[in-house]
A protein has these predicted regions:
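N-terminal cap/lid segment of alpha/beta-hydrolase-fold proteins
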Residues: 1-26
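Short, surface-exposed "cap/lid" segments of acyl-processing enzymes
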Residues: 24-68
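Short alpha-helix in the alpha/beta-hydrolase fold that links the catalytic acid
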Residues: 47, 208, 222-231
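Alpha/beta-hydrolase active-site loop
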Residues: 83-109
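Primarily recognizes the serine-hydrolase "nucleophile elbow" in alpha/beta-hydrolase
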Residues: 100-164
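Short beta-strand/loop motif that positions the catalytic acidic residue
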Residues: 205-207, 212-214, 218
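Catalytic histidine neighborhood in serine/cysteine hydrolases
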Residues: 233-251
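Catalytic active-site module of serine/aspartate enzymes centered on a nucleophile-bearing elbow/loop
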Residues: 246, 250, 254-280
Length: 280
């Protein structure tokens, strides 16, 4: 299994850093692209292991990447780009994902010839970009979300008022102890582009097979979000898999300490879904 790093630039000139995971045969034509969630990054916990397992089990290349506003710097591990984290928006993440798909289609990613058929796997907030992209971009042929959010604007009226008053809010990163800033751009994006960022409406427009995986004990995103996403998707091509007792990260931690029963189940379901539904 080869892991080939790459760096792209989005429309603002900001770097999108990622990796291509590919076996010695070069894999089939369909490519799986993984989107991390809020405060996540491509090398967090289960992502490298999941990428390697999906590449091995499905025979398809897998791409992992950091959204340009993830806050993770060139060392791939630490939140050293807090200015970008503060400016990040949902729309920017959708645009970043398009940059990755465009590069793969153009043959600009290492070890990959031109590809034009993609499967998306997204965790948590990454599901917003993935579901909307799957609804808008005909190159996407298959979708899986893990513990994804069903709503972009998740803040109360009180929180939004305080956010506007102060110009920013701060979120604790319990792993590092850092306070991570969110600027007004995120709130304004969620309001200005509310129609496009309606995740449930996007799910209802899907024309591709969609697997919703959600842990019943998710402490960050209610299992109700997963149920709503599955209910919104077309009934003939959408499937809901609840992982009994599964938490938000399916029991995985960072640094990665190995798989768990819940994570193993999610990977098995995901690999099967892509193998069955992502055409070459």
């Amino acid at each position: 299994m080869a892991r080939r790093p790459f760096q792209l630039a989005n429309g603002n000139g900001e770097p999108i850093r990622g990796d291509v995971w590919i076996d010695e045969t070069g894999g089939s034509d369909g490519v799986i692209v993984i989107c991390h969630g809020f405060k996540g990054f491509k090398d967090w916990g289960f992502f490298p292991s999941t990428a390697e397992q999906l590449a091995t089990r499905t025979g398809r290349p897998v791409v992992t990447f950091n959204f340009s506003g993830s806050g993770i710097g060139a060392d791939m591990e630490n939140f050293t780009e807090l200015d970008k984290f503060e400016r990040n928006t949902f729309t920017q993440e959708i645009d970043d994902l398009a940059v990755v798909l465009d590069a793969a289609q153009a043959g600009e990613l290492p070890a990959l010839t031109s590809r034009d058929r993609f499967g998306l796997l997204a965790h948590s907030r990454g599901g917003i970009a993935a579901v909307i992209t799957a609804a808008e971009d005909s190159r996407v042929g298959c979708l899986v979300t893990w513990n994804a959010v069903a709503y972009a604007n998740r803040w109360s009226a009180k929180q939004r008022k305080e956010w506007r008053r102060s110009g920013r809010i701060e979120i604790l990163n319990s792993r590092t102890g850092q306070m991570l800033p969110l600027g007004l751009a995120l709130l304004e994006d969620s309001e200005r582009n509310a129609q496009r960022l309606d995740v449930l409406k996007a799910a209802s427009r899907l024309s591709v097979p969609y697997l919703v995986i959600h842990g019943t004990d998710d402490e960050s995103v209610s299992v109700a979000d997963g149920v709503r996403l599955a209910e919104a998707g077309p009934s003939a091509s959408t499937r809901l898999e609840l992982i009994e007792g599964g938490g938000h990260t399916l029991g995985a931690v960072h640094p990665f300490q190995g798989t768990t029963e819940h994570l193993t189940r999610a990977v098995e379901l995901t690999a099967g879904w892509f193998s069955e539904n992502l055409a070459d």
